[in-house]
């Protein structure tokens, strides 16, 4: 405890009195330098990595981590291959999924074909199916060519119903 109203410089000059009620045990004891540090060894031995390797080979634990890493690598690669197969199958099924067609149509060769045309061409010879697709492709090409011939700036009705100028009889 610290005594109130006392000057620290007077502490050493005035002998402590019993009336103060404080014990006379010093708070700080002097330290000796010999107790602070351990004596330094005269010879220091530094063990290197090469000294530890023969010990590890003798223990037999050196092979265990390699086998564990190898099996983990195999398991991870098998899991990735399995996931790749699943993704491939999902994508394959998405592209080859049987698409629904409106009523009266049949899905053949990635197209919706009217059922009556499919029945008609299936009763014909086997080459008729290729002729059917040829007719469809020519129809779409012809449809595009007539639209281009008119011109995008003119309407189709204006070209068809355009009044012709009267012919004048020449001299």
Swiss-Prot record:
Keyword Membrane in annotation: yes
Matches recorded under InterPro entries: NSG
Alphabetized GO MF terms: clathrin light chain binding
Pfam family, one: Calcyon
Record's subcellular location: Membrane; Golgi apparatus, trans-Golgi network membrane; Cell projection, Dendrite; Endosome membrane
GO cellular component, one term: cytoplasmic vesicle membrane
Top-level taxon: Eukaryota
Positions on the Lumenal side per record topology: 93-171
Membrane topology, from the record: Single-pass type II membrane protein
GO biological process: clathrin coat assembly; endosomal transport; regulation of postsynaptic membrane neurotransmitter receptor levels
Transmembrane segments: 72-92
Residue ranges that the UniProt entry lists as topological domain Cytoplasmic: 1-71
Ranges of Polar residues composition bias in the record: 1-10
Keywords: Cell projection, Cytoplasmic vesicle, Endosome, Golgi apparatus, Lysosome, Membrane, Signal-anchor, Transmembrane, Transmembrane helix
Region: Disordered, residue numbers: 1-21
Similarity section: Belongs to the NSG family.
Protein known as: Neuronal vesicle trafficking-associated protein 2
Originating gene: NSG2
């Amino acid at each position: 405890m610290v005594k109130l109203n006392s000057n620290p410089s007077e502490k050493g000059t005035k002998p402590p009195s019993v009336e103060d009620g404080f014990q006379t045990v010093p708070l700080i004891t002097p330290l000796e330098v010999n107790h602070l540090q351990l004596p330094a060894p005269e010879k220091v031995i530094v063990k290197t990595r090469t000294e530890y390797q023969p010990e590890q080979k003798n223990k037999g634990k050196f092979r265990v981590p390699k086998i564990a890493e190898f099996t983990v690598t195999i398991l991870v690669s098998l899991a990735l291959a399995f996931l790749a197969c699943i993704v491939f199958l999902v994508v394959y099924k998405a592209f080859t999924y049987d698409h629904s067609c409106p009523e009266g149509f049949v899905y053949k060769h990635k197209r919706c074909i009217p059922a009556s045309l499919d029945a008609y061409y299936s009763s014909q010879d086997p080459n008729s199916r290729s002729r059917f697709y040829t007719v469809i492709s020519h129809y779409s090409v012809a449809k595009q060519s007539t639209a281009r011939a008119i011109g995008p700036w003119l309407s189709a009705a204006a070209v068809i119903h355009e009044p012709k100028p009267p012919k004048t009889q020449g001299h």
